Amino acid sequence: MQTKKYHVAKGDTVMVIAGKEKAKTGKVLQVLPKKDAVIVEGLNMVKRHVRARGNEPGGITEKEAALHVSNVQLYCTKCVKPVRTRIKVLENGEKQRTCVKCDSSLEN
């Protein structure tokens, strides 16, 4: 089985381009290839009821839920907006993601 390739990776700063969290930015915490989804820090918060275990108290906690990968786009800090990316091959053979508009590097 072939692994899926996405335009976002763990640690990238992304902006949500559709849905209830539209126009908000955050850092990608996790990429979920089986669900075609990403988890973004502080966005798409849901409440979960947690049962008490041992010395941990129970109660209602908030955590991030997954967003579909098509609803997020990489955020360029130079352009200050979500952008499409291009893969640029450097002279040493290394691949680097760059902004299509301003040609700046989007690597972490």
Swiss-Prot record:
One of its GO terms (molecular function) is rRNA binding. Pfam families: KOW, ribosomal_L24. GO terms for biological process: translation. GO terms for cellular component: ribonucleoprotein complex; ribosome. Keywords: Ribonucleoprotein, Ribosomal protein, RNA-binding, rRNA-binding. InterPro entries: KOW, Rib_uL2_dom2, Ribosomal_uL24, Ribosomal_uL24_KOW, Translation_prot_SH3-like_sf. SMART domains: KOW (SM00739). One of two assembly initiator proteins, it binds directly to the 5'-end of the 23S rRNA, where it nucleates assembly of the 50S subunit. Belongs to the universal ribosomal protein uL24 family. Part of the 50S ribosomal subunit. This is Large ribosomal subunit protein uL24. The lineage of its organism: Bacteria, Pseudomonadati, Thermodesulfobacteriota, Desulfuromonadia, Geobacterales.
